[in-house]
Structures are given as C-alpha cells and as structure tokens.
Amino acid sequence: MFEKGSLIPYLTAGDPSVEKTLEFLLAVEEFAGLIELGIPFSDPMADGKTIQESHYRALRNGFKLDDTFRILREFRRHSSTPVILMTYYNPVFRTGVKKFLGEAKASGADGILVVDLPVSHAGEFLDAAKEEGLKTVFLAAPNTPDERLREIDKASTGFVYLISLYGTTGARDRLPETAFEFVRRARKICNNKLAVGFGVSRREQVEELLKAGADGVVVGSALIELISRSENPVEELRRKVAELSGYSRAL
C-alpha cells in the first residue's frame, strides 16, 4: 500500500469543513506514501485530546458520514495517493458492514482500519472487505503477545499498525524505548509492512522508528494541532508534512 520509509499523515474529515479537508489532503498528498483519513465519531476512545477535539469540531458543524465519502470522491479526481479510512465500529455497524465497505470502495478508499474491532470478531468485516477488494489494517499494542500478533498479521492485508505506547494518541516529546523494542519484535513475526503511530510529532522520531524497522510512520495530533491554531493552515501543513517526510530541503 505504501513504499518503505513513507510518512503517513492523519487528518480528520470535516475539521473544520468539507472544503478545507479537501485542501488539506491535496496539500499533503505530494509527501505522503499513504493518507489516513479519520471519520469523526462522538466517542473516539483511542484518541487523545487533540484528535478528540477535531472530531467534536466536525460533528458540531454538522458533518455526516456521507461527507467522508464525498471528500474522498473529490480527492480521487486529483490524486491517486492511497487512502485508508480510520473509523470506529459503530458507524460501520449502523450503516451495515457490506453497505459501508461498498460505499468506501466506490468513493476511492484503498483500505479500512476499524479501531475498536478485534480480529476475533472481524469475520463478517473481513469477508466483506475481501469481496470489495479493500485492504484491512489492524492495530497491535506493545503488550500484544506474539501469537496474537501473528493473528493480526494474518488478518491484515494492507499493513499492521503498531501502537508506539500505552495510552491514547497525542504528540510526545520522546517516544518510550518500548516503541522501538516493539518494532523490532514485530519485524521478526509479521510478514506485512509495519506502520507505527501514536505520539510521533518530529522528523527525528520518524527517522528513529524507520531505523528500528518500521516501513511507515503515522503522524496525526501534531498536524491536527497545527491546523487548529494556524492562520494559514494549508501552507503550514504542507511545510510540516514535507519536513516530516524529509523533503524540506526541496521546498
């Protein structure tokens, strides 16, 4: 789904609007191996304060699930950069698994990550994703045992998403040593590519994770925070993603 050494920017759909999200996607796609587009949800339990607030801003402005697909369809008119949708299971269940995945595929999504769907309960989801030709991505935490990590790797057809730390999303000044130990352990077990997320906000952190064996690194909260406080978010977002990707010298 992405080249080794890729940066994977995360953006929340509809924060602060449909039109701005499309501008943000187009600003980062040049430097992204893959884009993760989050669907706003009222109880984003895996996310920290920064991304929670982005979900609430979008929902408060009247953002609906169908708006996510509308953004993606418009983005596909301009870019072929792979996109995975990140969501919680409630919107998938309420829509219907087959209908949700069918609309995701039709709008141009390449894969789906359902944060709170464990592999052991993902049978219907996996069958529907395979039928639609969508890649699946599952999360693994630093304390995930080896045997369960093998199950997660087997169920993932896109990549395995390694959580770098214990806790929720949110930029950290330093990543714990357990993050790098986890990457090295997963590298020995998983056949899929590995992307690491949660807590990453700096280029040196991206480089350290890639050096430890990650194929891609996800950055979310640092970008969402930039968007929320900037007077020129499109240009600042582009520069930040370029810097995180290692392309800053080319600007």
Curated annotation (Swiss-Prot):
Q: Which Gene Ontology cellular-component terms appear in the entry? A: cytosol
Name its pathway: Amino-acid biosynthesis; L-tryptophan biosynthesis; L-tryptophan from chorismate: step 5/5
The UniProt catalytic activity note for this protein reads: (1S,2R)-1-C-(indol-3-yl)glycerol 3-phosphate + L-serine = D-glyceraldehyde 3-phosphate + L-tryptophan + H2O
User: Which EC number applies?
Assistant: 4.2.1.20
- Enumerate the GO terms in the molecular function aspect: tryptophan synthase activity
Cite the active-site annotation: 36 (proton acceptor), 47 (proton acceptor)
Sorted alphabetically, the Gene Ontology BP terms of this entry are: L-tryptophan biosynthetic process
Q: Which family does it belong to?
A: Belongs to the TrpA family.
**Record text on subunit structure and interactions:** Tetramer of two alpha and two beta chains.
Name the job this protein performs: The alpha subunit is responsible for the aldol cleavage of indoleglycerol phosphate to indole and glyceraldehyde 3-phosphate.
Name of the featured protein? Tryptophan synthase alpha chain
Identify the species of origin: Thermococcus kodakarensis (strain ATCC BAA-918 / JCM 12380 / KOD1)
